[in-house]
Amino acid sequence: MLSNQTIEIVKATAPLIAETGPKLTAHFYDRMFTHNPELKDIFNMSNQRNGDQREALFNAICAYAANIENLPALLGAVEKIAHKHTSFLITKDQYQIVGKHLIATIDELFNPGQEVLDAWAEAYGVLANVFIQREEQIYQANASQEGGWRGLREFELVGKQLESEHICSFVFKPTDGSKVTKYKPGQYLGIYINSDKFENQEIRQYSLSSSVQENTYRISVKREQGGKVSNYLHDELNIGDKVKLAAPAGDFFMDVDTNTPVVLISAGVGLTPTLSMLESLTEHHAPVTWVHATENSKHHAFKEHVNQLVTAKENMNALIWYNQPTAEDKIGEDFHFTGFVNLHEIEAALKQDNVQVYFCGPVGFMQHVAKQLQELGVPQEQFHYECFGPHKVV
């Protein structure tokens, strides 16, 4: 527990931190990577360059300071971050390194005096212990399951298939020939790439894009313009190549009984976690509505596969939006609507009792979806979303 003195000091200095903005976390990361360059093998340096990770950490620090007297309010954020940390295999020692550089950053930017530094050090220590304990629980849970493991495990690429103009699926099988641990539909897999093409080890998380299989994992990756790892996977990773994987993780997953109505909404490569959910609903009794938005048929991944899943079940329905259909794309056959997703078209599905809505896609798309869900009266506790990359509130 934090002392009252520490709480008051953190509250008093929080406005100064907030006023500084992401400059604080920029200084922190620059300092940490200078003194501990080995951490460049852990952090996504692309997110450092575009500022996303710096903004995410700054927002987390501000949220912690704002809720210093109400830590339970942070449990949702802690769960999300803890899962991501286990995919990076974060250790207790690394928390100590981060704490050292965070306190040094506050000292160098503000020179607030030892009392303030001690208060922030105490506050950081309490939060770090919360993460360390939760992450240890996740590590142990993963390792204790059948087919589970802790740390990294070697897999072989046994399948590679282009799903659209920009999305390719990769199927991995463990080289030891044993089973793989089960996961919850919507979770992701951590992939570790070491190549002489990269200055540092690169770690990425990709949503598992199929229902649970006994011996394999499938991810489906969009080729991002300028994306180091996505382009490497598309162009360089071939059948028979070996990679190291961390166990499945993530707090975005579907957990419903067979009588709960489900709506799955996605845009672009955001369909990967929702496809895993859809494949897992083949024995579902309640209505299932699939909504997907993409540019046109050239970008429409898993089109035939989803059609087969939906047409095989009377309780499933699919609606497709194309933003820029080609001359060959036929409305009513390839897609149903043009432009941006309008959830009023599925208002009846969203008005069902206890309907659970899962959505994923670009941040702007998810903000558009969340706004419509609120307008249609869907309770916030009944919709769930996933951001690819550092988390953003929609």
UniProtKB/Swiss-Prot annotation:
Residues annotated for NADP(+) binding in this entry: G268, V269, G270, L271, T272, P273
Region (Reductase): 147-394
Domain FAD-binding FR-type: 150-255
Matches recorded under Pfam families: FAD_binding_6 (PF00970), Globin (PF00042), NAD_binding_1 (PF00175)
Keywords: Detoxification, FAD, Flavoprotein, Heme, Iron, Metal-binding, NAD, NADP, Oxidoreductase, Oxygen transport, Transport
GO molecular function: FAD binding; heme binding; metal ion binding; nitric oxide dioxygenase NAD(P)H activity; oxygen binding; oxygen carrier activity
Annotated site, Involved in heme-bound ligand stabilization and O-O bond activation, chain positions: Y29
E.C. no: 1.14.12.17
Classification via PROSITE patterns: FAD_FR, GLOBIN
Keyword Zinc: no
Entry annotated with the keyword Flavoprotein: yes
Entry binding sites for FAD: Y188, R204, Q205, Y206, S207, C387, F388, G389, P390
Residue span, Globin domain: 1-136
CDD domains linked: flavohem_like_fad_nad_binding (cd06184), HmpEc-globin-like (cd14776)
Stated role: Is involved in NO detoxification in an aerobic process, termed nitric oxide dioxygenase (NOD) reaction that utilizes O(2) and NAD(P)H to convert NO to nitrate, which protects the bacterium from various noxious nitrogen compounds. Therefore, plays a central role in the inducible response to nitrosative stress.
Protein name: Flavohemoprotein
Native organism: Vibrio parahaemolyticus serotype O3:K6 (strain RIMD 2210633)
Gene: hmp
